[in-house]
Design a protein with these regions (language model features):
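A short acidic, often aromatic-flanked loop/helix-cap motif at beta-alpha or helix-coil junctions
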Residues: 30-34, 149-152, 275-285
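Glycine-centered loop/turn motif at secondary-structure junctions
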Residues: 20, 138, 143, 215, ...
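Residue-level detector of family-conserved "landmark" positions at structurally sensitive sites
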Residues: 26, 144-145, 273
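TOPRIM fold recognition
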Residues: 1-10, 197, 209-298
Length: 298
């Protein structure tokens, strides 16, 4: 590879880092114009949530993103004002073609994940009440099913379509079926949302179950994680413009930040932790369990 090619790759990687997409140590860039997956600095072992595409042909340009967060960075070796008309046209056609390819590939992955998720869900058994996670969290099985040692939870959207499933291990580790479409998706914890009762959106299924138990007059769902709260809340708002929507994030810094963002974007209220939350509680499920144990002020 020529020195010029190495320079282009270095500039591309630097632009990604500046835009919030940092590659994991040892990851290399292949500038062949094809879509590649790559490990990011904050990926766990075995994860490759990053993707990129880099062209060396004039004008050298690329794009990269994080499938987990939706963050995306575009880069070109030339400033827009320095591109010739021919280069602008080449770049525009390239971007349009690659965007169409990327969207088609993403839709195919989503369809496959939904099909695999449906198979898993249909072949799972009702969850055992003695499952270690349920016992430790003091949760009833509810809608949960089980395959082997894993709890299986359905991930759906507001049309009722199954997007995929979430697996919960006995130790509490969670993962979604690969390729699943997360935006706007959720896990039910009680009655199906229909716009007739306030909708409370939590992060995890256990927390949604806890709030549903504490507030049976509302409808609680799990928005999957802090980063997905906004998209789920916005989908609900678009479906029910006048509905009372309440965001119920976890108590950590990320939860508070993402919860506030979701509330603002969806014109919703937020349920903040009260001043008398027992020490050590990180979400409303912890609060419910502390209350069951008779912890002072719970």
């Amino acid at each position: 590879m020529s020195a010029t090619s190495w320079d282009i790759i270095e500039q591309f990687v630097a632009a990604l880092a500046a835009g919030g997409i940092e590659l994991a140590p040892g990851q290399s860039i292949t500038p062949d114009g094809k879509l590649h997956r790559v490990r990011l600095a904050n990926d766990k072992a075995g994860q490759r949530t990053g993707w990129y595409r880099l062209h060396l042909d004039p004008p050298p340009a690329g794009v990269a993103g994080d499938w987990r967060t939706g963050c995306q960075v575009k880069w070109c070796s030339k400033r827009p004002e320095r591109l010739s008309p021919a280069e602008r046209d080449t770049l525009r056609r390239r971007i349009e073609r690659e965007q169409a390819e990327r969207e088609a590939g993403e839709q195919a992955r989503h369809r496959e994940a939904a099909q695999r998720g449906a198979w898993v869900w249909n072949h799972a058994e009702p969850a055992s009440p003695s499952h270690e996670y349920l016992q430790r969290k003091r949760l009833a099985p509810g809608i949960a099913r089980q395959r082997g040692a894993s709890l299986v939870l359905p991930v759906v959207d507001f049309t009722g379509h199954l997007r995929g499933v979430q697996y919960v291990q006995p130790d509490g580790q969670k993962r979604f079926i690969a390729g699943m479409a997360k935006r706007g998706a959720w896990i039910p914890a009680g009655p199906k949302p229909d716009g007739t009762r306030p909708l409370w959106i939590c992060e995890g299924w256990g927390t949604a179950c806890a709030l549903q138990a504490m507030r049976p007059e509302v409808c609680c769902i799990a928005g999957l994680d802090a980063g997905n709260l906004a998209s789920t809340a916005i989908e609900a708002r678009n479906r029910w413009p006048a509905l009372d929507i309440v965001i119920c994030p976890d108590f950590d810094k990320v939860g508070r930040q993402k919860g506030q963002e979701a509330a603002e974007k969806a014109r919703a209220r937020i349920l903040p932790p009260t001043a008398d939350i027992p020490e050590g509680c990180t979400d409303w499920l912890d609060v419910l369990n502390a209350k069951r144990q008779g912890v002072a002020h719970a």
